Swiss-Prot record:
Assembly description: Homodimer.
Localization per Swiss-Prot or TrEMBL: Cytoplasm
Organism: Campylobacter jejuni subsp. jejuni serotype O:23/36 (strain 81-176)
A single MF term (Gene Ontology): pyridoxal phosphate binding
Protein name, as recorded: Glutamate-1-semialdehyde 2,1-aminomutase
Pathway note: Porphyrin-containing compound metabolism; protoporphyrin-IX biosynthesis; 5-aminolevulinate from L-glutamyl-tRNA(Glu): step 2/2
CDD domains reported in the protein's UniProt record: OAT_like
GO cellular component, one term: cytoplasm
Length: 424
């Protein structure tokens, strides 16, 4: 069966033919590749084509596809049982592994997805502060729970409307939206709203393309939260163990009240978490009145994969330095080639994460990102795919370097970039 036929058949039985919208390739006016298998830095589609994979399952695969250590850990766990709905030693082992490196985090709770982690963190913040409103930032994605599917309305200092059908206005009105990297927009919202339970932010935004928050912006944001008895939530579902071993904390050293984790923490299996100090976490059921639960939360397969992934990352002290150098080489190379061709391009990296925008101006927030030339991106994406390079099929996604990549792979990629730019 070909990719084209597979997608046509999938559309008959699966809504939209995919189980997550961006996979449909609609943003690049194309159709998805159906993947048969992956190995290291490569994936292979059912037509027999191979690609250097910079999506890496949208971030979890720090060690690439089919890592032997993670596979071995999963196989060992599977032989004992895939799920029990009861505590296991693996849960405590992974909890200790995560918490040992964050002095401000004392307890953790595992869930099965990033959406669950952020949704639960917000409920926890509301329960702890006894306040109703939440503040998020335009362009930051925190999963698809109702209160977070809200984008900016007519100005950041207003109540906002849902950005998805099915989200009630009564839910959306409790979500305030500020401008990323703009502390004045935050101050304005706090001046007009005294019942903000929490501020949730991607300290390294990866869902409007890669846009890191500025150090002084985060520092001032933390002060505002502290002065207003508002909890600060860092959503590190993507950046945790990706931007550095300690995520944004390893870079900006700012201690958020709650951190959400995901992707790498599950080693490629469905796992996520939220963590905080004990006084906050202890109001979760069964100790307190904030309810959160999950049938597959902390399942042994995901815990085993997470332990193997984080243990390996922690042991390989030079890993993040290597990944950062490769990401730097890639983004600087792309920028140089674009300049030579006279194409508008902004490119950056943070650790093993990288992003690029087809725009002439620097990008520091969502409105800047929206100025990107989407038609140009679509042509570039198609050309790269034809040259064996698998990039995220959206201008507003982040790319990832894995440990199985090397200078040769980056050189191959840059040659594909050169050829792709020639054809634009």
């Amino acid at each position: 069966m070909t990719n084209k036929k597979a997608f046509k058949e999938a559309c008959k039985f699966i809504a939209g033919g995919v189980n997550s919208p961006v996979r449909a390739f609609a943003n690049v006016q194309s159709e998805p590749k159906f993947i048969s298998h992956g190995k290291g830095a490569y994936i292979f589609d059912i037509d027999g084509n191979s690609y250097i994979d910079y999506v890496q399952s949208w971030g979890p695969l720090l060690f690439g596809h089919c890592d032997k250590d993670i596979q071995k850990a999963c196989q060992k766990a599977l032989h004992k049982g895939s799920s029990f709905g009861a505590p296991t030693l693996l849960e405590t082992e992974l909890a200790k592994l995560v918490l040992s490196d964050f002095p401000h985090l004392e307890k953790i709770r595992f869930v099965s997805s990033g959406t669950e982690a952020t949704m639960s963190a917000i409920r926890l913040a509301r329960g702890f502060t006894k306040k109703d409103k939440i503040l998020k930032f335009e362009g930051c994605y925190h999963g698809h729970s109702d209160s977070l599917l809200v984008s900016a309305g007519s100005g950041a200092a207003t109540f906002n409307s849902p950005s998805s059908l099915g989200v009630l206005e009564d839910v959306a009105k409790h979500t305030l939206v500020a401008k990323y990297n703009d502390i004045n927009s935050v101050k304005e919202l706090f001046e007009k709203n005294k019942d903000i339970a929490c501020v949730i932010i991607e300290p390294i935004a990866g869902n409007m393309g890669l846009v890191p928050a500025k150090q002084d912006f985060l520092e001032e944001l933390a002060k505002i939260c502290k002065n207003n008895q508002t909890l600060l939530i860092f959503d590190e579902v993507m950046s945790g163990y990706r931007a550095s071993y300690l995520g944004s904390y390893g870079i900006n050293h700012i201690q958020a009240d709650i951190i959400t984790f995901g992707k790498v923490i599950g080693g490629g299996l469905p796992a996520a978490a939220f963590a905080s100090r004990a006084e906050i976490m202890d109001i979760l059921s069964p100790l307190g009145g904030v309810y959160q639960a999950g049938t597959l939360s902390g399942n042994p397969l995901a815990m085993a994969a997470g332990i193997a992934s984080l243990t390996k990352a922690k042991k390989k002290t030079k890993l993040y330095n290597k990944l950062g150098k490769l990401a730097k080489k890639l983004t600087q190379g792309m920028k140089k080639l674009a300049d030579e061709k006279g194409l508008p391009l902004q490119a950056c990296h943070v650790g093993s994460m990288f992003g690029y925008f087809f725009t002439k101006d620097p990008v520091s927030n969502y409105q800047d990102a929206l100025k990107s030339d989407l038609a140009l991106f679509s042509k570039f994406h198609k050309n790269m795919l034809e040259n064996g390079i698998y990039l995220a099929p959206s201008q507003f996604e982040t790319g990832f370097i894995c440990s199985k990549m090397d200078d040769k792979i980056i050189d191959t990629t840059l040659e594909a970039v050169r050829e792709s730019f020639k054809r634009i």
